[in-house]
């Protein structure tokens, strides 16, 4: 059973694994609510989070303030002889709605080629003072021998190498892509192609391959869609059915969900047919029927009387309703308009394949299997599952945490946290268990994971117990238990490993983690960097001397993350 549980907990899907150390500055006063901290990535001895009064006031553009700081601190960041202007590209500049600071998002480059996983965020206050730089910079690239050579492999050959390693011929959802990066692992730094293979059959996959641009060897790979034990997807694909939106009148229907509860549904009436298409929110919500095949998105769910009480309707009822709840949570709590904050439609497909024990975000929409009736019931019946998966989409459009090792475990934990908070928002039998409503219907009290007690299902609740192997993308669904426990303690309080945490409630938990995920976390955020970002987020929201700041720090003390 334990082995089975270990396999199944990777259901809810979409880095640098290292330890860190930090010390606080006392020499110069930081701006209001900015903590003076300097935290280094211990493995590569490069800063991963620095905050305080990092520069004086300035009338320059925010990005010029950042570049001036990086040039002044070239030795600290080990940039060699290159200027900051040649070492980084500005990818986004946004206003922080809380602090009214300007947030500059950077991508490290070398010879104008992006460095995989090396992104940074800098916060420049209204008076032009630089107050935060978050994100590890890959150091000493000018000293890496392989970066002095020429690539011998082209993009096409890199894709072929990835396809050969995959070992089977998939049916692609989109054409394979390949982009050249500077890539680092524990032993080497080289040019590599990052190849993306996205497909649904013979089983869903969204693989990232790293192919050495000099030797053509596969250096690493990971899949952001995880399969679980049970029947595989039906490989007999039908031609893609029409899935066009309809025009018509907004109406209200009703239906019974997977657990038998009745829900009100926002639908569209067009030509005497009702559709599960909700036009009333900032993002249109569509629910489709795969009809037990594997083509996406399927056909827009249609009904003759706007009453969805048939057994087959249940999965669609919950997918449609819970997508709306998740949208409302993020809109009402954070004024976020869909996962991309630009009104992107929310698409869900139910009845995917036959007896399929999985749910996943494929990069553009949600997909739900029906389960086999023993391990799972239809997976759209779990509100925390839907909140979890749509939060992966949000993370992809903000911090874009790499789905490996500590950054991947943080990615998973954020989805667990907000899946739970969405459940509390809707007040539909909320708890701190993940997947309890749809997992093992014949076993009461069972779940995929527990945030209150990760060890209940074999997950670590302290950094000293973390998984250090390479399975499950470096333990993304296992080590998430460490962050989950910290989040649970932050919301509810408690004593863990002799450390007492004062709880601040779920609402403040959500505000702090949302702010950190959107404005402080970078692609390769470690647990230690996450702690620093969350503490600073709490200081921004509640003040540097607040109980919230103290509790965030204590919650990480309790799980052994410094």
From Swiss-Prot:
Record EC number: 3.4.24.28
Annotated residues for binding of Zn(2+): 388, 392, 412
Reactions the enzyme catalyzes: Similar, but not identical, to that of thermolysin
Binding residues annotated for Ca(2+) 3, in chain numbering: 423, 429, 431, 436
Catalytic machinery residues: 389, 477
Signal sequence segment: 1-24
Compartments, as annotated in UniProt: Secreted
Keyword flag Transcription: no
Names of required cofactors: Ca(2+); Zn(2+)
Free-text cofactor note: Binds 4 Ca(2+) ions per subunit. Binds 1 zinc ion per subunit.
Family: Belongs to the peptidase M4 family.
Protein name stated in the entry: Bacillolysin
């Amino acid at each position: 059973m334990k082995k089975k549980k270990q396999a199944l907990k990777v259901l809810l899907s979409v880095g640098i694994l290292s330890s860190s150390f930090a010390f606080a500055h006392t020499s110069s006063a930081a701006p209001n609510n900015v903590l003076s901290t300097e935290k280094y990535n211990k493995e590569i001895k490069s800063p991963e989070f620095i905050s305080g009064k990092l520069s004086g006031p300035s009338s320059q553009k925010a990005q010029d303030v950042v570049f001036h700081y990086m040039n002044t601190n070239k030795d600290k960041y080990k940039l060699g002889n290159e200027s900051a202007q040649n070492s980084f590209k500005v990818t986004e500049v946004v206003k922080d709605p809380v602090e009214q600071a300007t947030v500059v998002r950077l991508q490290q480059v070398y010879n104008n080629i992006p460095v995989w996983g090396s992104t940074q965020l800098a916060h420049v206050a209204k008076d032009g003072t630089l107050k935060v730089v978050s994100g590890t910079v890959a150091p000493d690239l000018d000293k890496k021998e392989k970066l002095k050579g020429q690539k011998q492999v082209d993009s096409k050959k890199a894709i072929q190498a990835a396809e050969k390693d995959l070992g089977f011929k998939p049916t692609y959802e989109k054409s394979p892509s390949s982009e050249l990066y500077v890539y680092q692992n524990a032993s080497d730094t080289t040019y590599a192609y990052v190849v993306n293979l996205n497909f649904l059959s013979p089983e869903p996959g969204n693989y990232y391959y790293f192919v050495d641009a000099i030797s053509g060897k596969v250096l690493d790979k990971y899949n952001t869609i995880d399969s679980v034990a049970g029947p595989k997807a039906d490989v007999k694909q039908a031609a893609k059915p029409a899935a066009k939106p309809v025009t018509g009148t907004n109406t209200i229907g009703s239906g019974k969900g997977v657990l038998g509860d009745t829900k009100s549904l926002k639908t569209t009436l067009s030509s005497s047919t009702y559709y599960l298409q909700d036009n009333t929110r900032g993002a249109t919500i569509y629910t489709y029927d795969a009809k037990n095949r594997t083509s996406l998105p399927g056909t827009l769910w249609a009904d003759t009387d706007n009453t969805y009480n048939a057994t087959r309707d249940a999965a669609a009822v919950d997918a449609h309703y819970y997508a709306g709840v998740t949208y409302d949570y993020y809109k009402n709590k954070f004024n976020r308009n869909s996962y991309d904050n630009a009104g992107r439609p929310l698409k869900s497909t139910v009845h995917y394949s036959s007896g399929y024990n999985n749910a996943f975000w494929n990069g553009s929409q949600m997909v739900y299997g029906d389960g086999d009736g023993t391990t799972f019931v239809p997976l759209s019946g779990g509100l925390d599952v839907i909140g979890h998966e749509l939060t992966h989409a949000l993370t992809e459009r903000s911090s874009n945490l790499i789905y490996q090792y500590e950054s991947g475990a943080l990615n998973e934990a954020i989805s667990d946290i907000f899946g739970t908070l969405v459940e509390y928002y809707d007040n539909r039998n909320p708890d701190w268990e993940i997947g309890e409503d749809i997992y093992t219907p014949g076993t009461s009290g069972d779940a995929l994971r527990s945030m209150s007690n990760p060890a209940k299902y074999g997950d670590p609740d302290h950094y000293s117990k973390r998984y250090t192997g390479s399975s499950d993308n470096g333990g993304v669904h296992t080590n998430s238990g460490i962050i989950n426990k910290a989040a649970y303690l932050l919301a509810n309080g408690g004593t863990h490993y002799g450390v007492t945490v004062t709880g601040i409630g779920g609402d403040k938990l959500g505000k702090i983690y949302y702010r950190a995920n959107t404005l402080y976390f970078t692609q390769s955020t470690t647990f230690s960097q996450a702690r620093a970002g969350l503490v600073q987020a709490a200081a921004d929201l509640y003040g540097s001397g607040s109980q919230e700041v103290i509790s965030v720090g204590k919650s990480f003390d309790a799980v052994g993350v410094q």
